[in-house]
From Swiss-Prot:
It comes from Syntrophobacter fumaroxidans (strain DSM 10017 / MPOB). CDD domains: Chorismate_synthase (cd07304). FMN binds at residues 124-126, 276, 291-295, 317. This is Chorismate synthase. Its EC number is 4.2.3.5. Gene3D superfamilies: Chorismate synthase AroC. Reduced FMN (FMNH(2)). This reaction introduces a second double bond into the aromatic ring system. Disulfide bonds: none annotated. Its cofactor is FMNH2. Keywords: Amino-acid biosynthesis, Aromatic amino acid biosynthesis, FAD, Flavoprotein, FMN, Lyase, NADP. PANTHER family: CHORISMATE SYNTHASE. Pathway: Metabolic intermediate biosynthesis; chorismate biosynthesis; chorismate from D-erythrose 4-phosphate and phosphoenolpyruvate: step 7/7. InterPro entries: Chorismate_synth, Chorismate_synth_AroC_sf, Chorismate_synthase_CS.
Length: 351
Protein backbone atom coordinates (compact mmCIF):
# COMPACT_ATOMS: atom_id res chain seq x y z
CA UNK A 1 0.00 0.00 0.00
CA UNK A 2 1.50 3.29 -1.10
CA UNK A 3 0.40 6.73 0.11
CA UNK A 4 1.46 6.62 3.77
CA UNK A 5 4.10 9.36 3.41
CA UNK A 6 3.58 13.12 3.32
CA UNK A 7 5.84 16.11 2.72
CA UNK A 8 9.00 16.73 0.73
CA UNK A 9 11.71 18.15 2.99
CA UNK A 10 9.93 17.78 6.34
CA UNK A 11 8.63 14.31 5.49
CA UNK A 12 6.56 11.91 7.58
CA UNK A 13 5.49 8.29 7.17
CA UNK A 14 2.74 6.95 9.43
CA UNK A 15 2.21 3.25 10.11
CA UNK A 16 -0.03 0.91 12.10
CA UNK A 17 -3.69 -0.03 12.33
CA UNK A 18 -6.58 0.76 14.64
CA UNK A 19 -6.55 -2.69 16.26
CA UNK A 20 -2.90 -3.61 15.77
CA UNK A 21 -0.31 -3.65 18.56
CA UNK A 22 0.80 -0.06 17.92
CA UNK A 23 0.89 2.83 15.51
CA UNK A 24 3.47 5.49 14.91
CA UNK A 25 5.32 7.85 12.62
CA UNK A 26 8.81 8.39 11.27
CA UNK A 27 9.78 12.03 10.67
CA UNK A 28 12.62 12.65 8.22
CA UNK A 29 14.14 16.07 7.60
CA UNK A 30 13.57 17.71 10.97
CA UNK A 31 16.51 20.07 11.59
CA UNK A 32 18.89 19.39 14.49
CA UNK A 33 19.06 21.35 17.72
CA UNK A 34 15.32 21.70 18.42
CA UNK A 35 14.40 21.05 22.07
CA UNK A 36 11.98 18.10 22.12
CA UNK A 37 10.61 15.99 24.97
CA UNK A 38 7.76 13.45 25.10
CA UNK A 39 5.70 16.02 27.00
CA UNK A 40 5.79 18.36 23.99
CA UNK A 41 4.08 15.69 21.90
CA UNK A 42 1.84 14.42 24.68
CA UNK A 43 0.10 17.79 25.05
CA UNK A 44 -1.25 17.60 21.51
CA UNK A 45 -2.14 13.91 21.78
CA UNK A 46 -4.21 14.66 24.88
CA UNK A 47 -6.38 17.01 22.83
CA UNK A 48 -7.11 14.28 20.26
CA UNK A 49 -7.35 11.36 22.69
CA UNK A 50 -10.52 9.23 22.96
CA UNK A 51 -12.16 8.29 26.24
CA UNK A 52 -13.48 11.73 27.13
CA UNK A 53 -17.08 12.57 27.97
CA UNK A 54 -18.12 13.68 24.46
CA UNK A 55 -16.00 11.21 22.49
CA UNK A 56 -15.59 7.47 21.97
CA UNK A 57 -15.28 5.58 25.28
CA UNK A 58 -12.29 3.66 23.89
CA UNK A 59 -9.83 4.23 26.72
CA UNK A 60 -6.53 4.73 24.93
CA UNK A 61 -3.91 6.54 27.03
CA UNK A 62 -2.00 7.45 23.83
CA UNK A 63 1.36 7.63 25.57
CA UNK A 64 4.07 8.44 23.05
CA UNK A 65 7.59 7.03 23.11
CA UNK A 66 10.50 8.63 21.23
CA UNK A 67 12.61 5.82 19.78
CA UNK A 68 15.17 7.79 17.77
CA UNK A 69 16.28 11.18 16.53
CA UNK A 70 16.50 12.89 19.94
CA UNK A 71 19.57 12.97 22.20
CA UNK A 72 19.90 14.85 25.48
CA UNK A 73 16.60 16.59 24.85
CA UNK A 74 17.28 17.98 21.38
CA UNK A 75 16.73 16.71 17.84
CA UNK A 76 19.83 15.33 16.13
CA UNK A 77 18.76 15.78 12.51
CA UNK A 78 18.35 12.02 12.03
CA UNK A 79 14.93 10.37 11.52
CA UNK A 80 12.65 10.77 14.53
CA UNK A 81 10.64 7.63 15.26
CA UNK A 82 7.57 7.88 17.51
CA UNK A 83 5.41 4.97 18.70
CA UNK A 84 2.02 4.85 20.43
CA UNK A 85 0.90 1.45 21.70
CA UNK A 86 -2.78 0.47 21.47
CA UNK A 87 -3.95 -0.49 24.97
CA UNK A 88 -7.75 -0.79 24.72
CA UNK A 89 -8.43 -2.93 21.64
CA UNK A 90 -11.72 -4.85 21.48
CA UNK A 91 -11.75 -6.47 18.05
CA UNK A 92 -14.68 -8.66 19.09
CA UNK A 93 -16.93 -5.61 18.70
CA UNK A 94 -16.33 -5.86 14.93
CA UNK A 95 -16.69 -9.62 14.33
CA UNK A 96 -20.13 -9.26 12.78
CA UNK A 97 -18.70 -6.74 10.29
CA UNK A 98 -16.19 -9.19 8.81
CA UNK A 99 -18.62 -10.02 6.00
CA UNK A 100 -20.65 -6.80 5.87
CA UNK A 101 -19.77 -3.49 4.19
CA UNK A 102 -20.43 -0.48 6.42
CA UNK A 103 -22.16 2.41 4.60
CA UNK A 104 -20.01 5.53 4.42
CA UNK A 105 -16.78 3.65 5.19
CA UNK A 106 -13.98 2.43 2.94
CA UNK A 107 -14.72 -1.26 3.50
CA UNK A 108 -15.79 -2.00 -0.05
CA UNK A 109 -13.31 0.29 -1.80
CA UNK A 110 -10.37 -1.20 0.15
CA UNK A 111 -11.50 -4.71 -0.77
CA UNK A 112 -12.00 -3.75 -4.39
CA UNK A 113 -8.48 -2.29 -4.58
CA UNK A 114 -6.46 -4.71 -2.43
CA UNK A 115 -8.58 -7.86 -2.36
CA UNK A 116 -8.37 -7.86 1.43
CA UNK A 117 -9.43 -5.51 4.23
CA UNK A 118 -8.89 -5.20 7.96
CA UNK A 119 -12.44 -5.20 9.32
CA UNK A 120 -11.27 -4.53 12.90
CA UNK A 121 -12.23 -0.88 13.09
CA UNK A 122 -11.14 -0.14 9.54
CA UNK A 123 -7.41 -0.77 9.88
CA UNK A 124 -5.45 2.01 8.17
CA UNK A 125 -8.62 3.88 7.20
CA UNK A 126 -9.60 4.32 10.84
CA UNK A 127 -9.47 7.73 12.46
CA UNK A 128 -7.06 6.14 14.93
CA UNK A 129 -4.30 6.62 12.34
CA UNK A 130 -4.51 10.36 12.94
CA UNK A 131 -2.87 10.00 16.36
CA UNK A 132 0.40 9.54 14.47
CA UNK A 133 -0.24 12.70 12.45
CA UNK A 134 -0.87 14.70 15.61
CA UNK A 135 2.39 13.41 17.10
CA UNK A 136 4.27 14.49 13.98
CA UNK A 137 2.48 17.83 14.00
CA UNK A 138 3.70 18.44 17.55
CA UNK A 139 7.29 18.13 16.32
CA UNK A 140 6.54 20.53 13.47
CA UNK A 141 5.03 22.92 16.03
CA UNK A 142 8.31 23.01 17.98
CA UNK A 143 10.23 23.77 14.79
CA UNK A 144 7.82 26.54 13.73
CA UNK A 145 7.63 28.09 17.20
CA UNK A 146 11.32 28.88 16.94
CA UNK A 147 10.49 30.89 13.83
CA UNK A 148 7.57 32.78 15.34
CA UNK A 149 4.78 30.79 13.67
CA UNK A 150 1.66 29.82 15.67
CA UNK A 151 -1.10 27.55 14.32
CA UNK A 152 -4.51 27.20 15.97
CA UNK A 153 -7.59 25.20 14.91
CA UNK A 154 -11.12 25.53 16.27
CA UNK A 155 -14.72 24.56 15.54
CA UNK A 156 -16.86 27.17 13.78
CA UNK A 157 -19.88 24.98 12.91
CA UNK A 158 -21.34 21.77 14.33
CA UNK A 159 -24.56 19.96 13.39
CA UNK A 160 -25.99 23.13 11.84
CA UNK A 161 -24.94 25.33 14.78
CA UNK A 162 -22.58 28.23 14.01
CA UNK A 163 -20.40 30.51 16.11
CA UNK A 164 -21.66 34.07 16.56
CA UNK A 165 -18.60 35.47 18.30
CA UNK A 166 -14.87 34.79 18.41
CA UNK A 167 -12.85 34.71 21.63
CA UNK A 168 -9.47 33.05 21.07
CA UNK A 169 -9.05 32.50 24.81
CA UNK A 170 -12.25 30.43 24.86
CA UNK A 171 -10.97 27.78 22.42
CA UNK A 172 -9.23 25.60 25.01
CA UNK A 173 -11.91 26.09 27.67
CA UNK A 174 -14.52 23.77 26.15
CA UNK A 175 -14.42 20.25 24.66
CA UNK A 176 -15.30 21.46 21.14
CA UNK A 177 -12.35 23.86 20.85
CA UNK A 178 -14.99 26.46 20.01
CA UNK A 179 -14.27 30.21 20.26
CA UNK A 180 -17.91 30.93 21.24
CA UNK A 181 -18.90 29.69 24.72
CA UNK A 182 -22.64 29.96 24.01
CA UNK A 183 -22.32 27.98 20.80
CA UNK A 184 -20.18 25.36 22.57
CA UNK A 185 -22.90 24.79 25.16
CA UNK A 186 -25.48 24.32 22.40
CA UNK A 187 -23.15 21.87 20.64
CA UNK A 188 -22.88 19.80 23.80
CA UNK A 189 -26.66 19.54 24.06
CA UNK A 190 -26.81 18.53 20.41
CA UNK A 191 -24.37 15.66 21.02
CA UNK A 192 -26.64 14.18 23.67
CA UNK A 193 -29.65 14.44 21.36
CA UNK A 194 -27.85 12.66 18.55
CA UNK A 195 -26.45 9.99 20.84
CA UNK A 196 -29.97 9.19 22.06
CA UNK A 197 -31.17 9.05 18.44
CA UNK A 198 -28.33 6.73 17.38
CA UNK A 199 -27.16 9.20 14.77
CA UNK A 200 -24.13 11.42 14.06
CA UNK A 201 -23.21 14.82 12.63
CA UNK A 202 -20.46 16.84 10.98
CA UNK A 203 -19.26 20.42 11.12
CA UNK A 204 -16.60 22.89 10.02
CA UNK A 205 -13.10 23.34 11.43
CA UNK A 206 -11.13 26.52 10.81
CA UNK A 207 -7.33 26.66 11.04
CA UNK A 208 -5.38 29.91 11.25
CA UNK A 209 -1.63 30.43 11.18
CA UNK A 210 -0.04 33.59 12.56
CA UNK A 211 3.49 34.80 11.98
CA UNK A 212 4.09 33.15 8.61
CA UNK A 213 6.51 35.18 6.52
CA UNK A 214 5.66 36.28 3.01
CA UNK A 215 7.13 34.08 0.31
CA UNK A 216 6.19 30.54 1.37
CA UNK A 217 4.96 28.39 -1.51
CA UNK A 218 5.93 27.71 -5.10
CA UNK A 219 4.06 28.85 -8.24
CA UNK A 220 1.83 26.69 -10.46
CA UNK A 221 1.76 23.08 -9.22
CA UNK A 222 3.20 23.45 -5.73
CA UNK A 223 1.19 26.37 -4.43
CA UNK A 224 0.91 26.82 -0.69
CA UNK A 225 -2.89 26.81 -0.78
CA UNK A 226 -2.92 23.71 -3.00
CA UNK A 227 -0.71 21.86 -0.51
CA UNK A 228 -2.86 23.02 2.41
CA UNK A 229 -6.02 21.83 0.66
CA UNK A 230 -4.44 18.47 -0.13
CA UNK A 231 -3.22 18.07 3.43
CA UNK A 232 -6.63 18.74 4.93
CA UNK A 233 -8.41 16.59 2.34
CA UNK A 234 -6.14 13.69 3.34
CA UNK A 235 -7.92 13.56 6.71
CA UNK A 236 -10.52 10.81 6.42
CA UNK A 237 -13.67 12.71 7.42
CA UNK A 238 -12.90 15.90 5.48
CA UNK A 239 -15.00 16.36 2.32
CA UNK A 240 -14.27 19.98 1.40
CA UNK A 241 -11.67 22.72 1.96
CA UNK A 242 -11.68 26.48 1.40
CA UNK A 243 -8.97 29.10 1.83
CA UNK A 244 -9.81 32.64 2.94
CA UNK A 245 -13.22 33.73 1.64
CA UNK A 246 -13.36 30.41 -0.19
CA UNK A 247 -16.69 29.58 -1.80
CA UNK A 248 -18.13 32.89 -0.62
CA UNK A 249 -15.78 34.59 -3.10
CA UNK A 250 -17.87 33.17 -5.94
CA UNK A 251 -20.71 35.51 -4.93
CA UNK A 252 -18.50 38.58 -4.47
CA UNK A 253 -17.58 41.31 -6.92
CA UNK A 254 -13.93 41.85 -7.70
CA UNK A 255 -14.06 45.13 -5.83
CA UNK A 256 -15.30 43.24 -2.76
CA UNK A 257 -12.97 40.25 -2.95
CA UNK A 258 -9.70 42.07 -3.64
CA UNK A 259 -7.58 42.84 -0.58
CA UNK A 260 -6.52 46.51 -0.90
CA UNK A 261 -2.84 47.28 -0.37
CA UNK A 262 -1.79 50.11 1.93
CA UNK A 263 1.62 51.39 3.09
CA UNK A 264 1.10 49.20 6.17
CA UNK A 265 0.14 46.05 4.25
CA UNK A 266 -3.18 44.49 3.25
CA UNK A 267 -6.39 46.14 4.44
CA UNK A 268 -8.34 42.84 4.42
CA UNK A 269 -7.63 39.13 4.10
CA UNK A 270 -10.15 37.54 1.73
CA UNK A 271 -7.21 35.71 0.15
CA UNK A 272 -6.64 33.84 3.40
CA UNK A 273 -2.98 34.78 3.47
CA UNK A 274 -2.13 33.29 0.06
CA UNK A 275 -1.96 34.94 -3.39
CA UNK A 276 -0.73 33.16 -6.52
CA UNK A 277 0.15 30.21 -4.30
CA UNK A 278 2.58 32.24 -2.18
CA UNK A 279 2.05 33.48 1.38
CA UNK A 280 1.39 37.21 1.77
CA UNK A 281 2.49 37.58 5.38
CA UNK A 282 -1.11 37.89 6.56
CA UNK A 283 -2.72 35.17 8.70
CA UNK A 284 -3.23 31.97 6.72
CA UNK A 285 -6.85 30.85 7.10
CA UNK A 286 -8.32 27.54 5.92
CA UNK A 287 -11.58 25.74 6.66
CA UNK A 288 -12.39 22.03 6.42
CA UNK A 289 -15.89 20.59 6.00
CA UNK A 290 -16.20 17.45 8.14
CA UNK A 291 -18.77 14.79 7.25
CA UNK A 292 -20.87 12.93 9.86
CA UNK A 293 -19.34 9.81 11.43
CA UNK A 294 -20.68 6.90 9.32
CA UNK A 295 -20.72 4.37 12.21
CA UNK A 296 -24.18 4.81 13.73
CA UNK A 297 -26.53 2.53 15.66
CA UNK A 298 -29.52 3.71 13.64
CA UNK A 299 -30.45 0.89 11.17
CA UNK A 300 -28.98 1.30 7.67
CA UNK A 301 -29.31 -0.66 4.44
CA UNK A 302 -26.21 -2.30 2.99
CA UNK A 303 -24.99 -5.59 1.50
CA UNK A 304 -22.68 -8.35 2.70
CA UNK A 305 -19.63 -9.68 0.87
CA UNK A 306 -21.90 -12.02 -1.10
CA UNK A 307 -23.97 -9.09 -2.36
CA UNK A 308 -27.02 -9.94 -0.25
CA UNK A 309 -29.11 -7.13 1.32
CA UNK A 310 -28.48 -6.56 5.02
CA UNK A 311 -29.95 -4.20 7.61
CA UNK A 312 -27.05 -3.01 9.74
CA UNK A 313 -27.03 -1.38 13.16
CA UNK A 314 -23.42 -0.73 14.16
CA UNK A 315 -22.42 -1.53 17.72
CA UNK A 316 -19.14 -0.66 19.39
CA UNK A 317 -17.49 2.47 20.76
CA UNK A 318 -17.95 5.32 18.33
CA UNK A 319 -17.98 9.11 18.38
CA UNK A 320 -21.15 11.08 17.59
CA UNK A 321 -18.96 13.35 15.46
CA UNK A 322 -15.36 13.54 14.28
CA UNK A 323 -15.46 16.95 15.95
CA UNK A 324 -13.86 17.75 18.40
CA UNK A 325 -11.12 15.12 17.96
CA UNK A 326 -10.47 16.08 14.33
CA UNK A 327 -9.64 19.67 15.35
CA UNK A 328 -6.05 18.92 16.47
CA UNK A 329 -5.67 16.67 13.40
CA UNK A 330 -6.45 19.56 11.03
CA UNK A 331 -4.09 21.71 13.06
CA UNK A 332 -1.34 19.09 12.69
CA UNK A 333 -1.71 18.89 8.91
CA UNK A 334 -1.32 22.67 8.54
CA UNK A 335 1.71 22.58 10.85
CA UNK A 336 3.29 19.88 8.67
CA UNK A 337 2.73 21.82 5.45
CA UNK A 338 4.18 25.02 6.87
CA UNK A 339 7.19 23.22 8.36
CA UNK A 340 7.87 21.67 4.96
CA UNK A 341 7.72 25.00 3.14
CA UNK A 342 9.86 26.73 5.77
CA UNK A 343 12.67 24.37 4.74
CA UNK A 344 12.39 25.39 1.08
CA UNK A 345 14.75 28.11 -0.21
CA UNK A 346 14.19 31.33 1.73
CA UNK A 347 12.27 34.17 0.04
CA UNK A 348 14.45 36.81 -1.61
CA UNK A 349 14.58 39.96 0.50
CA UNK A 350 13.62 43.20 -1.23
CA UNK A 351 16.68 45.34 -1.88
Amino acid sequence: MAGSSFGRLFRITTWGESHGPALGVVIDGCPPGIPLAPEDIQRDLERRRPGKRLTSPRGEPDRVEILSGVFQGVTTGTPISLVIFNRDVRSGDYTELAEVYRPGHGDRTYEQKYGVRDWRGGGRSSGRETAARVAAGAVARKFLAGRGVEVKAYTVAFAGLHVDSFNRDEIDRNPFFCPDATAAAAMERRVEELRDAGDSCGGVVEVSARGCPAGLGEPVFDKLDARLAGALMSVGAVKGVEIGAGFAAAAMLGSENNDPLTPDGYASNNAGGVLAGISTGMDIVARAAVKPIPSISKPQQTVNTRGEPVTLSIKGRHDVSAIPRIVPVCEAMVLLVLADFMLHPAPVEKR
